[in-house]
Curated annotation (Swiss-Prot):
The lineage of its organism: Eukaryota, Viridiplantae, Streptophyta, Embryophyta, Tracheophyta. Residues 113-136 are annotated as: Disordered. GO terms for biological process: mRNA processing; starch biosynthetic process; sucrose biosynthetic process. GO terms for molecular function: metal ion binding; poly(A)-specific ribonuclease activity; RNA binding. The keyword Nuclease applies. GO terms for cellular component: nucleus; P-body. This is Carbon catabolite repressor protein 4 homolog 1. It comes from the Eukaryota. Pfam families: Exo_endo_phos (PF03372). Component of the CCR4-NOT complex, at least composed of CRR4 and CAF1 proteins. It catalyses: Exonucleolytic cleavage of poly(A) to 5'-AMP. It comes from Arabidopsis thaliana. Acts as a catalytic component of the CCR4-NOT core complex, which in the nucleus seems to be a general transcription factor, and in the cytoplasm the major mRNA deadenylase involved in mRNA turnover. Belongs to the CCR4/nocturin family.
Length: 602
């Protein structure tokens, strides 16, 4: 007969908005173990499984720490209460916890005071002009549901011991997504075998209790800062979103694939915050809040693209394209191959064309052309690294100043890549970047089209790949060129391109001086004008991610503010409960340049 051997949860700490899926191990009638579901609609030899979720309620109120949400709060920041910061952010579990977070509290107090002065109480992505004043970009909330589970308004009550707790039934499916009403309460999951004919329970039910439900940590909003020195507030669309004529926003974000999110590597991150069920919702909330017109994501697993990001971002008006890594050197489950995903808002752009770059194919062609037969195997082992790039040509649906006449199409080319090559293979990394740029040059030669090159290049400022991108050539004496055992970089004079690429975030260095811009400049590397970091782990901090643009066709209007290391180190490093990737998101607002101004620049 069907029976339940055991049940357990991947994480004992439930978070609001993050689906709970218990692991249920069964013994089938033939005595074999199984984890397959046996619903009432498909009973097994006259029996099926029934699930129920309960909220265990008591009269005792519990506050939880805003930094360590699995811990009970023991003290509260009075400054937060006076500043009308959301009360949940004011709690701490210890004096050390409060002391470590004090600088973060000061930022919260200052922003709350600024918001109160402007009369804006909405949760928002603030937009600041170069004088330091700002207005809000209205954010939208991510809709979270319990799938097929039901919420029952009437309580099923029963006393459970001397504490007088009450069980409130909240769901009847295998999975359950905690809601705000569950915060600070324990959840109880119950699984029992039921006779399909009599509807009576067979044997004892298996139950499991969770820890107290905690709210999803809420990162402090990052501000959008004007670079142009003009008022970028613009007009609000029907969703309350500022729009400047002829401008658009681009987000680039390595979201940290679940495949790479190992507790061995990121042992400082709580297991519940490292779990994909939590991270995917936190990442989605962050991405949606930015309301970018174009979103370039790296390290997106193909199953996560199809089953989560594509349908969820579709609800927010995005169309998505995906390029998975090639699998010539992949070993294991093909469902866990990651790649690059590019999304765009359907009301702002339409899809015209897609190009896919597979560096493995380029490596094979290169090997056939220049590598002696005796060295081909070793050459391929060095060159084949499974990386890809996704290049998308879009047509703008909004007004643009770049057109000579109102009827001309405004096209845009967006390249999205992840150059994941070991640090010591400097020749391979530079060769892949050069290969991508040569492909983009061909597209540029066929059309007068603005270009964006986004992604995680895994290369720091002043390295040969970064120099090639930003300067258009590499000095023959650059130390990176010393690593070239296959001779693929020779002659060095070929390491050039003609695209007028500029790093968007380098424009922070050119802004006029005020409190806001000085703060951002302190977060730039003075030598390269690039951010001090876009990747922050316990063992490494540095810049690996970039948004490059063609400076003869586009100008930067605004940039998403950079984060400071101190605020991230309160959780040791990234990822953390607040930020669910080991990288930070980069976002820039661009304006298409009028042709007359292009000619003056040229």
């Amino acid at each position: 007969m069907l029976s339940v051997i055991r049940v357990h949860l991947p994480s004992e700490i439930p978070i609001v908005g993050c689906e709970l899926t218990p692991y249920v191990l069964l013994r089938r009638p033939d005595k074999t173990p199984s984890t397959d579901d046996v619903p009432e609609s498909a009973p097994l030899e006259g029996h099926f499984l029934k699930y129920r979720w309960f909220r265990v309620q008591s009269d005792k109120k519990v506050a939880i720490c805003s930094v360590h949400p699995s811990e009970t709060a023991t003290l509260q920041c009075l400054g937060c209460l006076k500043s009308k910061v959301p009360v949940a952010k004011s709690y701490h579990c210890s004096t050390k916890c409060f002391s470590d977070a004090w600088q973060h509290h000061r930022v919260l107090h200052e922003r709350a005071a600024s918001a109160a002065t402007e009369g804006n109480d909405e949760e928002e992505l603030p937009r600041l002009n170069s004088s330091g004043s700002g207005s809000g970009v209205l954010s939208t909330s991510v809709s979270l549901t319990n799938g097929s589970s039901s919420v029952y308004p009437s309580a099923i009550t029963q006393k459970t011991g001397a504490g007088g707790e009450t069980l409130v039934e909240v769901g009847r499916s295998k999975t359950y997504t905690p809601m705000a009403d569950d915060i600070c309460h324990v959840l109880k999951f119950e699984c029992v075998v039921v006779n399909a004919e009599t509807k009576q329970n067979v044997g004892l039910s298996c139950t499991i209790l969770t820890s107290r439900v905690i709210p999803a940590p809420s990162p402090s909003p990052r501000r959008l800062i004007s670079i142009s020195g003009t008022d970028v507030t613009g007009h609000l669309d029907s969703n309350g979103r500022p729009l400047s004529m002829g401008t658009f926003t681009v987000l680039s974000y390595n979201i940290l694939s679940d495949t790479y999110a190992s507790s061995d590597i990121y042992s400082y991150c709580p297991t519940w915050a490292l779990a994909w069920t939590y991270r995917r919702q936190n990442l989605l909330r962050e991405i949606v809040k930015y309301r970018a017109d174009i979103v370039c994501l790296q390290e997106v697993q193909n199953d996560h693209f199809e089953e989560f990001f594509l349908p969820e971002l579709d609800k927010h008006g995005y169309q998505g394209l995906f390029k998975r890594k090639t699998n010539e050197v992949f070993i294991g489950n093909t469902n866990t191959i990651d790649g690059c995903a590019t999304f765009f808002r359907r009301d702002r752009f339409s899809h015209v064309k897609k190009y896919e770059v597979e560096f493995n194919k380029a490596a094979q062609s290169l090997t056939e052309a220049i590598i002696p037969v005796s060295q081909k195997k070793n050459a391929l082992n060095r060159l084949v690294k499974d990386n890809v790039a996704l290049i998308v040509v879009l047509e703008a649906k909004f007004g643009s100043q770049a057109a000579d006449n109102p009827g001309k199409r405004q096209l845009l080319c967006v390249a999205n890549t992840h150059v994941n090559v070991p640090h010591e293979l400097k020749d391979v990394k530079l060769w892949q970047v050069h290969t991508l740029l040569k492909g983009l040059e061909k597209i540029a030669a066929s059309a007068d089209i603005p270009m964006l090159v986004c992604g995680d290049f895994n290369t720091v400022p002043a390295s040969a790949p970064h120099t090639l991108l930003a300067v258009g050539k590499v000095d023959p004496l650059h130390p990176d060129l010393m690593v070239d055992p296959l001779g693929i970089l020779r002659p060095h004079s070929k390491l050039t391109h003609q695209l007028p690429l500029v790093s968007a975030y380098s424009q922070f260095a050119k802004m006029g001086g005020n409190v806001i811009t000085e703060q951002q400049r302190r977060r730039l590397d003075p030598a390269s004008s690039e951010p001090l970091f876009t990747n922050c782990t316990r063992d490494f901090i540095g810049t690996l991610d970039y948004i490059f643009y063609t400076a003869d066709t586009l100008t930067v209007e605004s940039l998403l503010e950079l984060l400071d290391e101190e605020s991230l180190r309160k959780d040791t490093a990234l990822p953390s409960p607040e930020w669910s990737s080991d990288h930070i998101a980069l976002l820039a607002e661009f304006r298409c340049m009028p042709r007359a101004r292009r000619n003056n620049i040229l």
